[in-house]
């Protein structure tokens, strides 16, 4: 909605889900197996844990993504996983629901509105531990190919504690608003 927002800034955003999300599925599958593949049982246990493991945090992230990218609108308490929690096999119908929200997939469908933006800025660390720099590079190239004006910056850092990058994006957005 360029008529409402006019400008976008994105720091280390999820894009190119085959790299950004898919590699974390096996860890989530292994974690959920301890709960018979039941996300609700896992979440109930997480509420009482004093200290979360790294695998718990990644599983929480995958469940949050599942709830967002492929919600069960008739039963909002139910999380639809993009994989079989017992075998780990991808469920193509569910995974395709995720992919339709991938900025790489969405770009072509929104070219006209993207071109109307006064500012389209995104950046990512070149050592992003969640592999998001690959998706950012792909999106930058996609925008180039589609003729979408944008500014992409890659910086020497990872995914964490990058709020200093606001010093780059906020002035750009402020200029857009003025």
Model-assigned labels for residue ranges:
Residues 1-178:
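Non-catalytic cap/lid and distal C-terminal segments of serine-dependent acyl enzymes
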